[in-house]
Regions:
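A phosphate-binding catalytic loop at a beta-strand-loop-alpha-helix junction
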Residues: 1-3
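Residue-level detector of flexible, active-site-proximal loop/helix-junction positions
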Residues: 7, 18, 66-68, 126-127, ...
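Conserved core of the sugar-phosphate nucleotidyltransferase
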Residues: 102-179
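Short intrinsically disordered coil segments
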Residues: 76, 179-180
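Conserved N-terminal catalytic core of the sugar/cofactor nucleotidyltransferase
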Residues: 5, 12-13, 17-96, 105-107
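Residue-level signal for pocket-adjacent positions within structured domains
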Residues: 6-9, 132
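Short, glycine/serine-rich, charged loops/turns that create anion-binding
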Residues: 43, 99, 126
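Short acidic donor-binding/metal-coordinating loop in glycosyltransferase active sites
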Residues: 96-97, 180
Length: 180
């Protein structure tokens, strides 16, 4: 916690470069990404803006205006805020920028494009303590999500959802519905 009290976790160096650089390099290698949007609270927005200055790819930083845990919007409302503020009307890949991955997101993006549908990544997680710290879904025989729980005390299933989502263009416009 002391490391991230006054500095954003996605910009912490790992192996000589910020976590976000590892993610961006992977995404750049896929050939699918046109630009990046970083959504930040007001406290850390300046750090992200400074980080973007040295980037060869297009990055837009959106300051959501919040400054405390009590006033933060939450992930879905942050996405909605950025979509409205930037008038985004294209496919979106949404990822949490504080994850260091041992795999490429390219396969996930290709899968979503081949299926022609919005997708969430999921994996089996059988440890209850870990299930209680993440999102858990259940799905039907067609892989359609039938329930979604954020950090459940009594999970209905064992499919953990890391923060990696591909949204089709037509589903981006429906983010408002998910909030209501």
């Amino acid at each position: 916690y002391p490391l991230t009290e006054n500095f954003p976790k996605p910009l912490l160096p790992v192996g000589g470069k910020p976590i976000l650089d590892w993610l961006a390099e992977d995404l750049e290698s896929t050939g699918f990404i046109d630009g990046y949007v970083v959504i930040s609270n007001h406290k850390f927005a300046r750090h992200f803006e400074e980080w973007t200055e040295a980037k060869s790819y297009h990055v837009t930083v959106v300051d959501d205006g919040t400054s405390t845990n009590e006033t933060r919007l939450g992930a879905v409302r942050d996405i909605q805020f950025a979509v409205e503020k930037l008038q985004l009307e294209d496919e979106l890949l949404v990822i949490a920028g504080d994850n260091l991955l041992s795999f490429s997101l390219g396969e996930f993006i290709r899968f979503a494009k081949e299926k022609g549908t919005s997708c969430v990544m999921c994996h089996e997680e059988n440890d209850l303590a870990r299930q209680q710290r993440t999102a858990i879904i259940t799905k039907d025989e067609n892989s359609m999500i039938t329930s979604y729980e954020e950090k459940p005390q009594r999970p209905k299933g064992n499919l953990a959802v890391p923060p990696f989502y591909c949204y089709r263009e037509e589903d981006v416009a429906r983010i408002d519905e998910a909030i209501k």
